[in-house]
């Protein structure tokens, strides 16, 4: 009989895998961060579109054009250093009535940084963003970081991540995720990034059109 090796999977690794690779976060993950917003009113026929990682000139202006075409407002969780590089795109997002959220200054994952490093990076971003909303990149937060964020911000996670960033996904796959998992109160995550934009050129207008056909209203966080 061959020796069977056992492997220990750290809790943090399990959390990373769960937060990155499923479209709808598990109940236990939502329970772990109860003060975070995962889903809005389940009795309201509304969804909340969110976009992470911008602003960048290759993606954000196109997304804004699509949103304007459909008369939809969204929330953009921005990387502070991208706002520093492209302040005119940030200003366009604001001028067109969209909501801004903090996505750290350098898109850092919480598990790789101390609370001091993490909080500094968040505050550095907020010097550009001036917002009370925050979304941790990849959903990664140590419990100490979660506690700190909860005192200073409204933490916005997601009810549906479209996985538009994945090289294994097509535009049709992204649209299919929206059709399969969107529901009342869903916070839906797309990305204004180089990894996602080619898929979004097809998937974003198709997703918005389908959601409108299903009777959903589009809201931003108050």
Predicted features and spans:
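A cross-domain feature marking catalytic cores of carbohydrate-active enzymes
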Residues: 51-53, 78-80, 102-104, 136-138, ...
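A short, conserved beta-to-alpha structural element at the edge of catalytic cores
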Residues: 69-96
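Alpha-helical membrane-targeting segments
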Residues: 17-37, 111-112, 116, 141-147, ...
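Intrinsically disordered, low-complexity proline-rich regions
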Residues: 1-5, 10-12, 17-18, 126
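His/Asp/Glu-enriched short active-site or ligand-binding loop at hydrolase and phosphoryl-transfer sites
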Residues: 140, 145-179, 215-222
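Acidic-and-aromatic substrate-binding clefts and catalytic sites of carbohydrate-active enzymes
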Residues: 54-58, 77-86, 108-116, 135-142, ...
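N-terminal pre-catalytic segment of deacetylase/amide-hydrolase enzymes
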Residues: 6, 15-50, 55-69, 85-88, ...
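CE4/NodB-like, metal-dependent polysaccharide N-deacetylase domain
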Residues: 64-73, 98-99, 105-108, 115-143, ...
């Amino acid at each position: 009989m061959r020796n069977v090796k056992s492997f220990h999977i750290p809790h943090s690794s399990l959390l990373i895998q769960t937060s990155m690779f499923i479209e709808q976060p598990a109940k236990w993950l939502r329970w772990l961060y109860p003060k975070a917003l995962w889903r809005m009113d389940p009795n309201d026929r509304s969804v909340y579109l969110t976009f992470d990682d911008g602003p960048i000139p290759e993606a954000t202006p196109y997304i804004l054009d699509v949103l304007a075409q459909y008369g939809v407002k969204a929330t953009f969780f921005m990387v502070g250093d991208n706002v520093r590089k492209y302040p005119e795109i940030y200003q366009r997002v604001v001028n067109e009535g969209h909501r801004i959220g903090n996505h750290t200054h350098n898109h850092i994952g919480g598990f790789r940084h101390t609370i001091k490093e993490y909080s500094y990076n968040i505050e550095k971003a907020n010097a550009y963003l001036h917002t009370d909303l925050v979304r941790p990149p990849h959903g990664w937060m140590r419990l100490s970081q979660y506690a700190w964020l909860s005192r200073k911000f409204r933490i916005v996670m997601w009810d549906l991540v479209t996985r538009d960033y994945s090289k294994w996904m097509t535009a049709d796959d992204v649209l299919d995720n929206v059709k399969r998992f969107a529901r009342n109160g869903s916070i839906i995550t797309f990305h204004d990034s180089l990894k996602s934009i080619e898929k979004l050129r097809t998937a974003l207008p198709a997703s918005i059109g389908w959601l409108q056909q299903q009777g959903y209203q589009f809201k931003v966080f108050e």
